[in-house]
């Protein structure tokens, strides 16, 4: 299925869908450090463009004739870091994403965002726009730790189809989830050579020491050393003297990027693009679930549905 990735970042969603057999024909982003990294790892083009420029975006995307548009509009205005403020401007990119999709009219669309985005007026408005123009929608919240990622990271996915109802797709996704969360030790074995690690908390009211025998907390866009004055939290998994911060590469591996994936830019830029990315295995889970759904006899009988796989 010819696919274009909008707000592609360094390519987590692209890579997961490629690994599942989708043809990524192009990607679009507006942050040069992420674009530089994307270009190091993929042979198809990534275009530098502000997707708020809807007319320019539509003209560009039409040249690639995508059958599927995937993308995660920036989510800072929906995130749990502080109060939500949908008036900050970046949340409006969710509406821009929907407008672009409606102008292109691909057979399929997948929109990713943070878990709480589904409660926002802008997210609901974007879904209404798609539904009003004939897209059947399925919405699901997926925990990455149940999708082959050693990380507690919940994300909202909206899947839209222009050629018939997909009301039962969310059930297919739920049925394919693992029965228990993947831990850091499950994924790395003993290769980290530590039982505990430090993840800098948003506030010191939260714990910062985690065990490899549990999933990682959500990988964020910052990675800081252990403060010399750090005070133990009652819920810390172990003593701070037994812990160390994860390296940039280790954080990318928790995001399930392959070992040979090349990140470029300053350390802070790399940390940010890693934290912003959709985990590769989460994207792969979503893509293979869509394949499984399309391969059901009922879906194959739809005369309007091309055979992509």
UniProtKB/Swiss-Prot annotation:
Ordered alphabetically, the record's keywords are: DNA-binding, Methyltransferase, Restriction system, S-adenosyl-L-methionine, Transferase
Database matches in PANTHER family: CYTOSINE-SPECIFIC METHYLTRANSFERASE (PTHR10629), DNA (CYTOSINE-5)-METHYLTRANSFERASE 1 (PTHR10629:SF52)
Q: Where is the SAM-dependent MTase C5-type domain?
A: 1-297
Is-annotated flag, keyword Transferase?
yes
Can you state which reaction this protein catalyses?
Answer: a 2'-deoxycytidine in DNA + S-adenosyl-L-methionine = a 5-methyl-2'-deoxycytidine in DNA + S-adenosyl-L-homocysteine + H(+)
Q: What is this protein called?
A: Type II methyltransferase M.HgiDI
**UniProt record similarity statement:** Belongs to the class I-like SAM-binding methyltransferase superfamily. C5-methyltransferase family.
- Record: active site: 75
The function of this protein is:
A methylase that recognizes the double-stranded sequence 5'-GRCGYC-3', methylates C-? on both strands, and protects the DNA from cleavage by the HgiDI endonuclease.
Task: State the Gene Ontology BP annotations.
Answer: DNA restriction-modification system; methylation; negative regulation of gene expression via chromosomal CpG island methylation
Q: Which domain of life is it from?
A: Bacteria
Name the encoding gene, please: hgiDIM
Record flagged with keyword Transferase: yes
Report the GO molecular function annotations: DNA (cytosine-5-)-methyltransferase activity; DNA binding
EC number(s)?
Answer: 2.1.1.37
